[in-house]
Design a protein with these regions (language model features):
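Pocket-lining segment of extracytoplasmic ligand-binding domains
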Residues: 1-58
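An extracytoplasmic/periplasmic, membrane-proximal ligand-sensing/linker region
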Residues: 51-123
Length: 123
């Protein structure tokens, strides 16, 4: 068992933001604002893991702030791939999902990434 902090995935995004296609097409400034806000929040968590853990601990009964803070410190919150870099990372994940039979064998990883990735922050 591994995670995305080791091996070939060590420098890949661990999370992506899915935004409804109509929002991207019809209200791109809103999609861009949501994306920018999430990136700002990621940076804040990375810079303030103890405070973030204390805030989140109030919403869970399964972990304390003291348990959560080290988890937050281990995450790659400073990694924000955009456009071509994001597409490459998504294609890598898609290939792995094919190998695990989550995606159909006919799914083209590059084509999948091209279809689902949109850089809403691009001018």
């Amino acid at each position: 068992m591994t995670n995305n902090l080791a091996g070939e995935f060590a420098h890949c995004a661990c999370c992506v933001l899915g935004i409804r296609g109509s929002l991207v097409r019809d209200e791109r400034p809103v999609a861009a604002a949501v994306t920018a806000a999430l990136m700002d929040a990621q940076e804040w968590v990375a810079e303030n893991p103890d405070e973030a853990a204390a805030i989140f601990a109030g919403f869970t009964k399964v972990a304390t702030a003291e348990q959560l803070a080290p988890m937050l410190r281990s995450h790659a919150h400073h990694h924000h791939p955009m456009d071509g870099d994001l597409k490459q990372e998504i294609a890598l994940y898609a290939q792995e999902l094919k190998l695990a039979s989550v995606f159909k064998s006919s799914t083209g990883p590059t084509q999948f990434a091209d279809r689902v990735c949109v850089d809403v922050l691009a001018a």
